[in-house]
Each structure stands twice: as structure tokens, then as C-alpha cells.
């Protein structure tokens, strides 16, 4: 343990299940609730918080596997804890549930360290920008025209966010006509100046994605996220070579190796990273550096209030996804959430840690573990 540095005393966990405010669906999945794993790390009279949007099973990974290799370590030695956690999950697998559990703990440890040192996480990491660009994200395939109009108008007119994303690839790519009608609607609502992105969540085949992308050109779409499965590296590379919008993927990169495979395959124009899945802040920084070595930008996937600080410390950041479902939960559960007004999030340089405090009483009604 580092001299005079307090040791991590414990990792406490809670699982919350939060109903969505309306049925949500994308190209390949539908859901009506979201599960959050919350981790609280304690040391030196302070506590750090982290979370992941995952499954309840991640809680047992923290309590049964990770807590034992983190407790007792210096609260300042986050890198050592990250390495210990990665080694501890060898036999249960590094991807999926384990990666999301590790991510929640890692985030909590960075928050704790910054609070112990009395500085915001973004200053601890090394701030390169004050404001982090965001894009409004939702536009679910389950929405009707009125819901879509209301959401897009709120982002562009009320929040003044100059870039938005909607879901396409509905029903595994079987409703192309409705996909295109919804893209046309989105362009009508946001006007000619705002950027328009689409996300198929792997709903199309390779040839279908190329065909759809060419039709999207009429609407000025500049970002085509996961047109085919992110496991289909060859398909992504083929699509990237034949269409104008940037091809993006990476939200299911569970480790640095996953990000490396996307980059090495020439599969993406912009690498997506998710701090709640890739291994936390520690691995997000490494993934961003890996992308920079190939002259690629990175985009932060979902969980906007968790991404703001690390995003402000990444030179090759493009933007952060201001995802409807997650920003709603973060506003429900925490004080200190950031305002996206003007299309940016601005971490407060005067508030230590990640700058958020759990409103435990408000969250308690959703607690399931």
C-alpha cells in the first residue's frame, strides 16, 4: 500500500430495476426496463460511486470475485486494482457480465481517488477540454410519429443539441420502408443544419446495409452505427469501403483486445467505447490511446454522466451519446447530473470526484438487490 494512503475498506453493491417511460426497441431488441448495478467503494472517510447498466448477475461477480482482490489495496492505486480484477475473472470469462462488473468497480475507484485528493476526476486524468460535445440519442423503432417528433424537437430546440441519432434496422432489417420514412421524418423535424445519425444495432445484412446507406444520402446521414453485427468485422469493413457515412462500432468491446480487432480489421471510421462495459475509466483511456495510434477518434456510448469526465480528458474524442434511457435514470437517481444545453456537457472543475451524489431515498423504490 502507498505510504499514508488509505486502503479500500469495502465494496458495497445495489441492484436497481427501472421501468422505461415508454416501450423501447431498436433493430434487434425490445425492452421495457433497465437494470443498474451500483458500486460504492469506501476509504479514508470518503466514498466513490460507479455503475453499469447490466444484469443483476453482475452483483455476485463484484461480491464473490472482485471485492476480495480490491479491498485492502491503496485507494490511490487504481491501476493495480484494475489489473487484479482482470486476472481474478480468468475462469469465469472476461467479457459480458464480468466486464460490466469490473467497469462499475473501476469507475467507483476513480471517483473515490479523486474525492480523497479533493479534485474532479477530469483534473485527475488531465483535462484537455472544458466542454464535451453530445448527441441526442433515442428515436426508438417503437416510437410513433408524435413521440419521435417530441423527442427530436426537445433536443434540437429546447436543449440546442446540434446532432441527433435514431434507430433503424427495425425487426432485423425487415422494415426498410419504415426505416426510411422515419429517417425522412427526423430530417424534417431537426431541419437542414443539425447532424443526423442512424443506428441499426446489427439489424441488416452486408448488402442490405450498403443499399440502405445509399438511400440515406438524400437525408444527409453522416453516421451509420453497427449496420451489421459488430462481430462481423469483414462485413463492417466491406460496408465502410462502399458508403459515405462513417461506419461505427465498439459498444460491445469488452476489452482492449476487442477494440484492437475492430481497428486492425479496418472496420470503423470512429471507435465507440463504453465506460460501463469496456473495463471502466482505466480501459476507456487505453482504448482511446489505441484508436489515436491509428488516427481514429472515439465516441462514448451511453451513460452520459459517467462519460463526461473521462471524455474531457481524451484528445481524440468526437462526442458522447446523450442516451434517453440512461440520462433519465441518472436524473432520477443522482444530484449533480450535467445539463446538455448547447450540445455540450461541462464537468464542474470545483466539485471533487465525478460530481454526483446518490439520492438513496429516491432510488430505494427501484432496488431489487
Question: Can you describe what each PLM-predicted range is?
Answer:
Residues 10, 41-117:
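Metal- or metallocofactor-binding catalytic centers and their adjacent structured scaffolds
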Residues 2-20, 34-36, 299-369:
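Flexible C-terminal active-site loop/helix
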Residues 27-32:
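Short Gly/Pro-enriched turn/cap motifs at secondary-structure boundaries
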Residues 130-243:
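Metal-dependent enolase-superfamily TIM-barrel catalytic cores that perform enediolate-based chemistry
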Residues 106-142:
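Glycine-rich, aromatic-flanked loop segments that form ligand/cofactor-binding clefts
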Residues 8, 45, 66, 105, ...:
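Conserved, mostly hydrophobic/aromatic
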Residues 60, 214, 220, 231-344:
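Shared catalytic-loop signature of beta/alpha-barrel
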Amino acid at each position: 500500500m502507498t505510504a499514508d494512503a488509505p486502503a479500500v475498506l469495502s465494496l458495497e453493491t445495489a441492484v436497481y430495476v427501472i421501468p422505461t417511460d415508454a416501450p423501447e426497441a431498436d433493430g434487434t431488441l425490445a425492452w421495457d426496463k433497465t437494470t443498474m448495478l451500483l458500486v460504492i467503494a469506501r476509504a479514508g472517510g470518503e466514498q466513490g460511486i460507479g455503475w453499469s447498466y447490466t444484469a443483476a448477475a453482475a452483483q455476485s461477480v463484484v461480491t464473490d470475485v472482485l471485492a476480495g482482490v480490491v479491498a485492502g489495496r491503496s485507494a490511490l492505486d487504481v491501476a493495480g486494482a484494475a489489473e487484479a480484477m482482470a486476472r481474478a475473472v480468468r475462469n469465469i470469462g472476461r467479457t459480458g457480465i464480468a466486464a460490466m462488473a469490473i467497469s462499475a468497480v473501476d469507475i467507483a475507484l476513480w471517483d473515490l481517488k479523486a474525492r480523497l485528493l479533493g479534485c474532479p476526476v477530469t483534473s485527475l486524468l488531465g483535462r484537455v477540454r472544458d466542454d464535451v460535445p453530445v448527441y441526442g440519442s433515442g428515436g426508438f423503432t417503437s416510437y410513433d410519429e408524435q413521440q419521435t417528433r417530441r423527442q427530436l424537437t426537445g433536443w434540437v430546440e429546447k436543449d440546442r443539441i446540434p446532432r441527433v441519432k435514431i434507430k433503424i434496422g427495425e425487426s432485423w432489417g425487415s422494415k426498410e420502408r419504415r426505416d426510411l420514412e422515419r429517417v425522412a421524418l427526423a430530417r424534417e423535424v431537426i431541419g437542414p443544419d443539425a447532424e443526423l445519425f442512424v443506428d441499426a444495432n446489427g439489424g441488416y445484412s452486408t448488402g442490405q446495409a450498403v443499399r440502405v446507406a445509399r438511400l440515406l444520402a438524400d437525408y444527409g446521414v453522416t453516421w451509420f452505427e453497427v449496420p451489421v453485427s459488430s462481430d462481423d468485422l469483414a462485413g463492417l469493413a466491406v460496408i465502410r469501403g462502399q458508403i459515405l457515412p462513417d461506419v461505427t462500432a465498439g459498444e460491445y468491446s469488452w476489452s482492449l483486445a476487442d477494440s484492437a480487432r475492430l481497428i486492425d480489421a479496418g472496420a470503423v471510421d470512429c471507435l465507440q467505447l463504453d465506460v460501463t462495459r469496456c473495463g471502466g475509466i482505466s480501459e476507456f483511456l487505453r482504448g482511446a490511446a489505441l484508436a489515436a495510434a491509428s488516427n481514429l477518434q472515439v465516441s462514448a456510448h451511453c451513460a452520459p454522466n459517467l462519460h463526461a469526465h473521462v471524455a474531457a480528458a481524451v484528445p481524440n474524442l468526437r462526442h458522447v451519446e446523450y442516451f434517453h434511457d440512461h440520462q433519465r435514470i441518472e436524473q432520477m437517481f443522482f444530484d449533480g447530473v450535467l445539463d446538455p444545453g448547447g450540445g455540450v456537457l461541462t464537468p464542474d472543475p470545483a466539485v471533487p470526484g465525478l460530481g454526483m451524489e446518490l439520492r438513496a431515498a429516491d432510488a430505494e423504490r427501484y432496488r431489487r438487490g
